[in-house]
Amino acid sequence: MAEQVALSRTQVCGILREELYQGDAFHQADTHIFIIMGASGDLAKKKIYPTIWWLFRDGLLPEDTFIVGYARSRLTVDDIRKQSEPFFKATPEERPKLEEFFARNSYVAGQYDDPASYKHLNSHMNALHQGMQANRLFYLALPPTVYEAVTKNIQETCMSQTGWNRIIVEKPFGRDLQSSNQLSNHISSLFREDQIYRIDHYLGKEMVQNLMVLRFANRIFGPIWNRDNIACVILTFKEPFGTEGRGGYFDEFGIIRDVMQNHLLQMLCLVAMEKPASTDSDDVRDEKVKVLKCISEVETSNVVLGQYVGNPNGEGEATNGYLDDPTVPRGSTTATFAAAVLYVENERWDGVPFILRCGKALNERKAEVRLQFRDVAGDIFHQQCKRNELVIRVQPNEAVYTKMMTKKPGMFFNPEESELDLTYGNRYKNVKLPDAYERLILDVFCGSQMHFVRSDELREAWRIFTPLLHKIDQEKPQPIPYVYGSRGPTEADELMKRVGFQYEGTYKWVNPHKL
């Protein structure tokens, strides 16, 4: 293997800048104003301000970029700095750059439903570029309850008259098909689809984006990526921690709305879709919509719901169950774990189960796509062979590996499980790539919508899950208890086995570069 040359962060950012500035859509010379609606909130201080700082620090933003915070709270830039800077991870050497960054920040206080407040915000932004061409990006870091008032006032009062306007909308995009359609219809009445960026940060993950290249740039996968060779597909999202005092928000939505209906379903689309005509945003999203249209509504017989309980042998938070969280309503039946089986009813995938599973307070932090292949026909090894699997590990330790059988060293033909290792982190050692939020915000600056959710995608996703969600909301079935730190309810394993997944439990991936 050729020796890998480690790139410094400066070199990597230089390559990224070159890629960005060569693109037609990245208007480096223009003034850009990035407006954070809800600047006083948790999302803004923990994610958005740090992300904009990292992009500014690494020279990835257009040079003449201003950041404007807007919220109801009477704050100053110094207040915003005190709240958000602990999440910046800035080094002492970066202090001068940090001062430059905050010199480009300003803050405007105002109500979300008051037209006069937006006139004041617009006057403030106009003063920043004094009549020159300026583009405006509005990030709605707000609860959906105020979306309608905020978007209406932005459209009527705060749109740039000399450049483009783009609006970033955070999930949840509604609670069901009806509320999502209502929100989509409202926003679509104010903005064109090419101005709307519905952000699902999982679509910014490197390995999620890598799915398309793996599938369509490698000849070896094309002939086997179908129902004749693949027995089942498992899409997993596991967190090792519970709600930890933040259960009030989670209880309103639950694990299906929070993770399954968006993150996991988007990954399913990338696994199942046909090759798009090009990598243009709409070509890719057209193929994803075709997949969603082939999926029927989830059947309750193919769903397992769970809720974690305290581990009597655990320590700290692990001793607390979901209902022990003081912010969770007493007796709540909200699921913190869900497994569901979907079927893509088309020629390529007919009969192949797509198993979606996600949960909190589980045994590990992991997000992955696992394709389990069918048994080898004509077994000559006396049932010693396990099924091949292709695993795309999204987090942690980004990796792609194939579980396969090889001969065990010795005199006899004894097969054993091994892996063909394509560990991403080792191949690109020391390469610091933008994280999901950095990548997606750069996409908005560039006008690329490939990794954002289109209105028809959203509609189909809610169509699939809304009947199940309504049934759960109305009947409030008792979720199956599972112990904090476990693999989840055993009933989920039984469901997976019933639809065709074979869990051997004899193999664990080991990063060979850390041995």
UniProtKB/Swiss-Prot annotation:
D-glucose 6-phosphate binds at residues 171, 201-205, 239, 258, 360, 365, 395. The modification Phosphotyrosine is found at residue 503. The modification N-acetylalanine is found at residue 2. The keyword Ligase does not apply. GO terms for cellular component: centriolar satellite; cytoplasmic side of plasma membrane; cytosol; intracellular membrane-bounded organelle. NADP(+) 2 binds at residues 357, 366, 370, 393, 401-403, 421-423, 487, 503, 509. It holds the Pfam family G6PD_N. It catalyses: D-glucose 6-phosphate + NADP(+) = 6-phospho-D-glucono-1,5-lactone + NADPH + H(+). Pathway: Carbohydrate degradation; pentose phosphate pathway; D-ribulose 5-phosphate from D-glucose 6-phosphate (oxidative stage): step 1/3. The modification Phosphoserine is found at residue 8. The modification N6-(2-hydroxyisobutyryl)lysine is found at residue 171. The active site is at 263 (proton acceptor). Keywords: Acetylation, Carbohydrate metabolism, Cytoplasm, Glucose metabolism, Hydroxylation, Membrane, NADP, Oxidoreductase, Phosphoprotein. The modification N6-acetyllysine is found at residues 89, 171, 403, 432, 497. It is a peripheral membrane protein. Acetylated by ELP3 at Lys-403; acetylation inhibits its homodimerization and enzyme activity. Deacetylated by SIRT2 at Lys-403; deacetylation stimulates its enzyme activity. It is found in: Cytoplasm, Cytosol; Membrane. Its EC number is 1.1.1.49. InterPro entries: G6P_DH (IPR001282), G6P_DH_AS (IPR019796), G6P_DH_C (IPR022675), G6P_DH_NAD-bd (IPR022674), NAD(P)-bd_dom_sf (IPR036291). Its main location: cytoplasm. Cytosolic glucose-6-phosphate dehydrogenase that catalyzes the first and rate-limiting step of the oxidative branch within the pentose phosphate pathway/shunt, an alternative route to glycolysis for the dissimilation of carbohydrates and a major source of reducing power and metabolic intermediates for fatty acid and nucleic acid biosynthetic processes. Belongs to the glucose-6-phosphate dehydrogenase family. Homotetramer; dimer of dimers. Interacts with SIRT2; the interaction is enhanced by H(2)O(2) treatment. Forms a ternary complex with ALDOB and TP53; this interaction is direct. ALDOB stabilizes the complex inhibiting G6PD activity and keeping oxidative pentose phosphate metabolism in check. This is Glucose-6-phosphate 1-dehydrogenase. It comes from Cricetulus griseus. The gene is G6PD.
